[in-house]
């Protein structure tokens, strides 16, 4: 019974073997350049949020200090981006965070990551398609909405007010474009991205030309007077401003940090670059450059637009839904709103492509590995994942057609933040592993590689304890090169660190008042957590790193990945309970698929069974040869 449980546990953490000699091989068409990747990352990340988010955050959270909010959010996003960039250099294959988890922490975590990325991209595609439809309808006077509400109104809970035929057509059109070929899709994306960037440059330049620096230093007295007028009060005595204390930080630095948490989601989308590993030329160089440059461009755009917006008009007058058209009207440039509308549609188009593009590639990678249904890995004559693309498009179209996606959008955040956290943890684990544990090639025919090379991480932990390989001296004075023992120390420390981060994030979010009130239990839990955290980080720092060099490596290890994990976990804890319930339902469906199909059809399971069969056969042959030799020797020495 125990042996069966151990075998089952090992199967959950079996890792994907990557042949280092075949990293450049691909069944997909390698036709994308570094510029294509930058355009894809910028287009996906710099969506319609740049036209809306700045007004919402500036008015309600940050004021003029929204530029600092975007800077903090950009730094947090860059930490995740650098982790993706290193993995893109190490494993330039299709699959993004799913693949990175598979080669590092095992099959079950890889499936969880991939399954959540599928959810994120499906909801993202559907919601952006509906937003595109709504924006276009608003430009033409709302005729589509009026017509659909009149003839196709739906009154069922959970469903949209009316079916969005326009959004369905958009998704199906995009699916056809992606099925036709990635090269053509990249050209369309570059055109829309270029228009979007040009419009944003126009907005930024206009803002600095027509802006007034006094809008960054509004006095508290002025804000109180405005509050009095708004509330229709006769006297300003004992009246507190509704718009903060004025100045550059009207809501304090706490408001700036709150704005940064919202702005963080504006940088989500760059991870689509990591799914192009088998379709880009020179991926080990292009993927890191694409991720870093696209994040830099997006930060400059968000920083510039938010600065221009808050310079053009006082932050308390900004419109939360469409701030840019109102700002241009405020400075007397009303017709500029049509330029903004064109840019908004282009931004939505690139964002739609950025959500749709990685979805079939995640499906393709999982199906090719056998953890999802095999038919999804079928390729067209143009080397495009046509089956996965059509399945993804159909699913997203149905959701956009029927469902009210507002309640589901928060679920996107769980999938994205979980992927970010896992990739950061995987970078930590991988950098402290012995080279052979990652770089061993696939087993050639007839070669036995069962034994130490087949040990999973959990097995190495058991061996470490059994052999007594870790002492206080070895922890503080480890060898110069990574070993199984030093790798296991890092793995255990990373797991404990993540658990401590979860505890601290939960404590700060739900029991922050207890900490402020200096309650003993809260201070005790916080102090113990911080002590364990410091010990774990210290132990990780003491262990040797691999000397294997790649084209890009995350700097400031282990601090930068750990900080990235903290930011991502903290943001996940902020999500509502309803979101986590919906997430649990989605995961339950995923586990049914994995334990009912994927676990038994995985390529890694087949490879392991083949290796075991070869090893058993060799052992049998060796035993027979020994028996024959022994028998011959006995006959020769027998006195008879």
Swiss-Prot record:
InterPro entries: AA/rel_permease1 (IPR002293), Cat_AA_permease (IPR004755), CAT_C (IPR029485). It is a multi-pass membrane protein. It holds the Pfam family AA_permease_2. GO terms for cellular component: plasma membrane. Its main location: membrane. PANTHER family: CATIONIC AMINO ACID TRANSPORTER 2, INNER MEMBRANE TRANSPORTER YGJI-RELATED. This is Cationic amino acid transporter 2.
């Amino acid at each position: 019974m125990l042996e069966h449980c151990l075998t089952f546990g090992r199967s959950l953490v079996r890792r994907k073997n990557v042949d280092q000699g075949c990293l450049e091989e691909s069944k997909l068409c390698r036709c994308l350049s570094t510029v294509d990747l930058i355009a894809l990352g910028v287009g996906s990340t710099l969506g319609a949020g740049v036209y809306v988010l700045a007004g919402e955050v500036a008015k309600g959270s940050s004021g003029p200090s929204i530029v600092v909010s975007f800077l903090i959010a950009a730094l947090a996003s860059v930490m995740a981006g650098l982790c993706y960039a290193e993995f893109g250099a190490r494993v330039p294959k299709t699959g993004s965070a799913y693949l990175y988890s598979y080669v590092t922490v095992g099959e079950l975590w890889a499936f969880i990551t991939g399954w959540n990325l599928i959810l994120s991209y499906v909801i993202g595609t559907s919601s952006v398609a509906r937003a595109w439809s709504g924006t276009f309808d608003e430009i033409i006077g709302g005729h589509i909405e009026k017509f659909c509400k009149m003839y196709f109104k739906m009154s069922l809970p959970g469903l949209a007010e009316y079916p969005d035929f326009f959004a369905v057509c958009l998704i199906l059109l995009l699916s056809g474009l992606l099925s036709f070929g990635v090269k053509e899709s990249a050209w369309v994306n570059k055109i829309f991205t270029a228009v979007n960037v040009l419009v944003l440059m126009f907005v930024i330049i206009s803002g600095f030309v027509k802006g007034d620096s006094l809008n960054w230093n509004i006095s508290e007295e002025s804000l109180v007077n405005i509050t009095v007028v708004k509330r229709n009060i006769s006297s300003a005595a004992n009246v507190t401003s509704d718009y903060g204390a004025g100045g550059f930080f009207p809501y304090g630095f706490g408001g700036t940090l709150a704005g940064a948490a919202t702005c963080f989601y504006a940088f989500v989308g760059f991870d689509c670059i990591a799914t192009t590993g088998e379709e880009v030329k020179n991926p080990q160089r292009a993927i890191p450059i694409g991720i870093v440059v696209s994040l830099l461009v997006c930060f400059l755009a968000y920083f510039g637009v938010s600065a221009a917006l808050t310079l053009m008009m006082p932050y308390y007058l900004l419109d939360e839904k469409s701030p840019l058209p109102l700002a241009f009207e405020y400075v007397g440039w009303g017709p500029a709103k049509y330029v903004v509308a064109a840019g908004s549609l282009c931004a939505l188009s690139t964002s739609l492509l950025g959500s749709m593009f990685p979805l079939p590639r995640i499906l393709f990678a999982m199906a090719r590995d056998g953890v999802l249904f095999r038919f999804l890995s079928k390729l067209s004559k143009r080397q495009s994942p046509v089956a996965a693309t059509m399945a993804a498009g159909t699913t997203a179209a149905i959701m956009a057609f029927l469902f009210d996606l507002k309640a589901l959008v928060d679920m996107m955040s769980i999938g994205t933040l979980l992927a970010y956290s896992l990739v950061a943890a995987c970078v930590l684990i991988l950098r402290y592993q012995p080279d052979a544990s990652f770089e061993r090639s696939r087993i050639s025919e007839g070669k036995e590689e069962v034994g130490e090379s087949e040990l999973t991480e959990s097995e190495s932990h058991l061996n470490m304890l059994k052999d007594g390989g870790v002492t206080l001296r070895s922890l503080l004075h480890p060898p110069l090169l990574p070993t199984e023992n030093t790798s296991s120390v890092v793995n255990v420390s990373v797991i404990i660190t993540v658990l401590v981060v979860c505890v601290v994030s939960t404590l700060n979010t739900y029991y922050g008042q207890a900490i402020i009130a200096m309650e003993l239990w809260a201070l005790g839990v916080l102090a113990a957590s911080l002590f364990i955290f410091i010990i774990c980080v210290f132990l990780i720092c003491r262990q040797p790193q691999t000397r294997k060099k790649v084209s890009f490596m995350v700097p400031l290890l282990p601090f930068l990945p750990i900080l990235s994990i903290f930011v991502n976990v903290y943001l996940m804890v902020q999500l509502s309970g309803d979101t986590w319930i919906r997430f649990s339902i989605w995961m339950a469906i995923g586990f049914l698929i994995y334990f009912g199909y994927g676990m038994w059809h995985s390529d890694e399971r087949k490879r392991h069974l083949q290796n075991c069969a070869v090893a058993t056969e060799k052992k049998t042959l060796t035993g027979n040869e020994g028996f024959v030799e022994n028998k011959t020797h006995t006959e020769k020495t027998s006195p008879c």
